[in-house]
Curated annotation (Swiss-Prot):
It comes from the Bacteria. Its main location: cytoplasm. InterPro entries: Alpha/beta_knot_MTases, RlmH-like, tRNA_m1G_MTases_N. It catalyses: pseudouridine(1915) in 23S rRNA + S-adenosyl-L-methionine = N(3)-methylpseudouridine(1915) in 23S rRNA + S-adenosyl-L-homocysteine + H(+). CDD domains: RlmH-like. This is Ribosomal RNA large subunit methyltransferase H. Homodimer. GO terms for cellular component: cytoplasm. It is found in: Cytoplasm.
């Protein structure tokens, strides 16, 4: 099983890349974590935002292979504790399908992406900056793995 974070937005600050890579390298080879960046469409004063979101959604879905699981990160998704995420990670592993975690742009995910989602996950009721979400996701996937493997990282 491979986990891909498919996120709208690119050219993140260096600290974001370093934070993400820190957790990627901590994970074992049998749980690869990959980042796929979808360029954010330019939003001008008179932009058709619905069209831009739809285009970003199409680009996101083009990175998903047939049969792979889609998990969207949404404000109204289900909040998971660390232990619940670890249980989900174990279910995903046993299912043996690749998992795609989908993070939309500033206006959220395209309806087409949400319609394909098998699970909706909310990190927090707070609005979080997109760069921070990447690091937070990397850390939480790592933490869930440590719970499953009995590693002392999560106490």
């Amino acid at each position: 099983m491979r986990i891909k974070l498919i996120a709208v937005g690119s050219r993140m600050p260096r600290w974001v890349e370093e934070g993400w890579q820190e957790y990627v390298k901590r994970l074992p080879a049998e749980l690869p974590l990959e980042l796929v960046e979808i360029p954010l469409n330019t939003r001008g004063k008179n932009a058709d935002v619905a069209r831009l979101i739809r285009q970003e959604g199409e680009a996101m879905l083009s990175k998903v292979q047939p049969g792979e699981r889609i998990v969207t990160l949404e404000v109204h998704g289900k909040p998971w504790s660390t232990e619940q995420l670890a249980a989900e990670l174990e279910r995903w592993r046993l299912d043996a399908r690749n998992v795609n975690l989908m993070v939309g742009g500033p206006e959220g995910l395209a309806p087409e992406v949400c319609a394909r989602s098998e699970q909706r996950w909310s990190l927090s009721p707070l609005t979080l900056p997109h760069p921070l979400v990447r690091i937070l996701l990397g850390e939480q996937i790592y933490r869930a793995w440590t719970v499953l493997s009995g590693h002392p990282y999560h106490k």
